[in-house]
Amino acid sequence: MLRYDERKLNNLTLSSFSKSGVSSDTRLYIAKENTDKAYVAPEKFSSKVLTWLGKMPLFKNTEVVQKHTENIRVQNQKILQTFLQALTEKYGEKAVNNALYMSSINMNKPLTQRLVVQITECVKGADGGFINLIKNKDNVGVMNAALVIKGGDTKVTEQNNDVGAESKQPLLDIALKGLKRTIPQLEQMDGNSLRENFQEMASGNGPLRSLMTNLQSLNKIPEAKQLNDYVTTLKNIQIGADRFSQWGTCGGEVERWIDKASTHELTQAVKKIHVIAKELKNVTAELEKIKAGASMPQTMSGPTLGLARFAVSSIPINQQTQVKLSDGMPVPVNTLTFDGKPVALAGSCPKNTPDALEAHMKMLLEKECSCLVVLTSEDQMQAKQLPAYFRGSYTFGEVHTNSQKVSSASQGGAIDQYNMQLSCGEKRYTIPVLHVKNWPDHQPLPSTDQLEYLADRVKNSNQNGAPGRSSSDKHLPMIHCLGGVGRTGTMAAALVLKDNPHSNLEQVRADFRNSRNNRMLEDASQFVQLKAMQAQLLMTTAS
């Protein structure tokens, strides 16, 4: 039986922060911290003197004063976090999160009894709902908010969604602590414990409820957009009857589904939760860096859930253009764009695992790709034992395939063509497959004519009337080599040139790098061949 009790940081409770006979504006700190005898104490007279000296130009740069200033900063941070933890123990994470979001109280000030009362009153109001928080006359710092009453439901809409700078670090700390507490609990979950303990997990301080509450903190900090987008992708993954974001609530579709689900269905649900928990460790790592002084990430690779052949440190996957299945599952594939228009789907060779191949096939089926272009040579496939998933008949999870060779040709780079029939449930789709058997890694094709011929073959693969270009990630060619950066980028750029020979190849490369990663079109010899193809096309156009 799993336990979800959170271990307290120490023995301090809310009552520990109330000190009779002490001025309400005296700075508080934790004495004998990290021991069983820790207690909240008022600042000593000697400390006050050093703090006063730190305000005087003559003394503020002395070693003893500077050391004291740093100690005070650390003390202030520790007691604030301990106080917020005590508040969370009493009122719950949601109330504390909401209070920090709505309140404009300066969290960078030293903790005093006056500040303790102000923050506690905000949390009490938040515990009773946003309306109480706004109506509370003792709440001295509520951001501009508008009440919207619709159909009997009262909601609060923020006129200013940005939180104050002083509230950002506490919100990030809450998210970090929540993740560090809940991830191990999610990793221990199994199908039986999920069925038996779901109500406990999805209420109070249970791991599912706490996780969803803590992750909301990131949505309140504009600078944390990359982190928030990452967790939003994970929360949108379908598990059982609903998206993962709904698994932190009792009494809904998720709970009803769990009651009726088979042992196999629960096992599959837990498997997805485990891979999501593993991905959330990446968020934890980023939050740890921010806590240590790093800036907010400006870019982040999207979650791969174990489906990617290469680590994102080697082959990044831009999460803003990452392709997602209908059930919200992200796949390690990007939509390449040029001049704002989609050109192709691009990825690495699928990882040789059942889950990765099933996701890859579902993507081809759901996106109704105009064709599949495999640029890994026959020699490379054998040397690296890459899956020849596009020829023969296979079953990958829910997807069944049956591929028939249509033609072989030495012209245009030894292209084999297949028609691959895909089926998943009632959905059926047949996709043309072009396998280029003699394109060496990190090198150009044997001739520029072969590159142009291949581009023509791809453009002419127009399955079921699907257009070669689209305004979305549907009906596009899916292209991959081994890593999905060199040959794949070259092939996609050749398609752009066939559309418009006057296209700026440097801009094509820049747009592809923005679309997927900075390694796109990284091989100089392949880029030289693209320029030769462009010159050839321009001469033909001129004549």
UniProtKB/Swiss-Prot annotation:
The keyword Hydrolase applies. Residues 315-543 form the Tyrosine-protein phosphatase domain. The active site is at 481 (phosphocysteine intermediate). InterPro entries: Globular_prot_asu/bsu (IPR011070), Prot-tyrosine_phosphatase-like (IPR029021), Protein-Tyr_Phosphatase (IPR050348), PTP_cat (IPR000242), SptP_N (IPR015203), SptP_N_sf (IPR044899), Tyr_Pase_AS (IPR016130), Tyr_Pase_cat (IPR003595). Requires SicP as a chaperone for its stability and secretion. One of its GO terms (molecular function) is GTPase activator activity. Forms a complex with SicP. GO terms for cellular component: extracellular space; host cell cytoplasm. Pfam families: SicP-binding (PF09119), Y_phosphatase (PF00102), YopE (PF03545). The keyword Hydrolase applies. Residues 162-293 form the Bacterial Rho-GAP domain. The lineage of its organism: Bacteria, Pseudomonadati, Pseudomonadota, Gammaproteobacteria, Enterobacterales. Effector proteins function to alter host cell physiology and promote bacterial survival in host tissues. This protein includes tyrosine phosphatase and GTPase activating protein (GAP) activities. After bacterial internalization, GAP mediates the reversal of the cytoskeletal changes induced by SopE. This function is independent of its tyrosine phosphatase activity, which remains unclear. It is found in: Secreted; Host cytoplasm. This is Secreted effector protein SptP. It catalyses: O-phospho-L-tyrosyl-[protein] + H2O = L-tyrosyl-[protein] + phosphate. PROSITE patterns: BACT_RHOGAP, TYR_PHOSPHATASE_1, TYR_PHOSPHATASE_2, TYR_PHOSPHATASE_PTP. Residues 35-139 are annotated as: Chaperone-binding. Its EC number is 3.1.3.48. Its main location: secreted. The record marks 209 as: Arginine finger. Keywords: GTPase activation, Host cytoplasm, Hydrolase, Protein phosphatase, Secreted, Virulence.
